[in-house]
Amino acid sequence: MALRSATADTSERRGDRPGDGDAPPPRHGTTRPGAWFAALLLLTVSTVLACRIADTDAVTPIPQLLAFLPWLLAPTALALLFAALSHWRIGLVWGVAALAVIAWYIEPYGKTMEPGGVPVAEIRVLTANVEFGQATDGLIEAVSTQRPDLVFVQECEATCEKKLEQAFCRNGRNGRNGKGGKADKDGGYPYRQAVQSVTAKGSDGSVILSRHPLKPAKGIPATMGMPGATADVDGQEIRLQLAHPMPPLPSHLGTWRKELAALRDYAAANIGRPTVVAGDFNATQDHAAFRRILDTGFMDGARLTGDTRTPSWPALTAPAFGAQIDHVLVSRGFTATRTRFLELGDTDHRALVVDLTLRKST
């Protein structure tokens, strides 16, 4: 009896109770809510990265998320935090691997060839999406300050076009039809090529303004206006093409791909001559459809000046957060010396100004 009593007392002191041996072990890894949340974040990030690696834009929501690929660092870091708090080792390894892949693809894409030869033309290009014409006044001020040689304007409806004509079409010369003349050195833009808006909002209206004489050239048929022209800049013929494909909305992905493919075909056909393609591409270097344009040999002006990741949209959060979907692309023979992103107000885009030099071998 004494032995049994001692054993019972010892058992009670240890806290043993009937059935204690059947208690479940402490939960670890993905059995914890934090680990499940980390796994969900990492799965989303990994799906986007897999499409980037596979060189495809896939289907919604991948194209929309690819536009913000650098910002996937934030959910990945959050996933790592939850994985660490949950002691989920696989999640930690997974998160670190995802960070490494994102860091790899943040690097600039595309060529940066430095052409030889002597400078034959200096060109300042400004491109701006004025959002249904709302930012026309801001654009006029920016043009007056920056004094670009060429201006590419997207979403320029009838009122926008009229204001631009009143502000910059001087000396009675209207170059709407691209007829000859001389370069305007006094701040005017007498030469223009336009696709007039036929919709109420005016998103399909586009205008190319030039100090230098323009000749009409075949544009690219698209939902929104994409006019073309040929400029005579100091005796050098330079092809101009305004870019404004449809945005990658879920209901318009097919059109977005088709119109970017048309820009790619244009680039491939004109890589051997001095050419500038500028505008709102509704795509970043992380979209396969845009990279195929760069693969023709065209170079991004912002890439040439080290500003690849500077956001141009949405203006409300840029430069702290956003994506660079506005571009100035150039063919062989061009160098870029400076890039600026300007706040216009009343538009969801920042204007882009790039200083270019055309060189030719002697």
Language-model segment annotations:
Residues 2-167, 173-183, 360:
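N-terminal, active-site-proximal structural segment of metallo-dependent hydrolase catalytic domains
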Residues 125, 131-144, 153-172, 179-362:
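Soluble catalytic domains of enzymes that build or remodel membrane lipids, polysaccharides, and related
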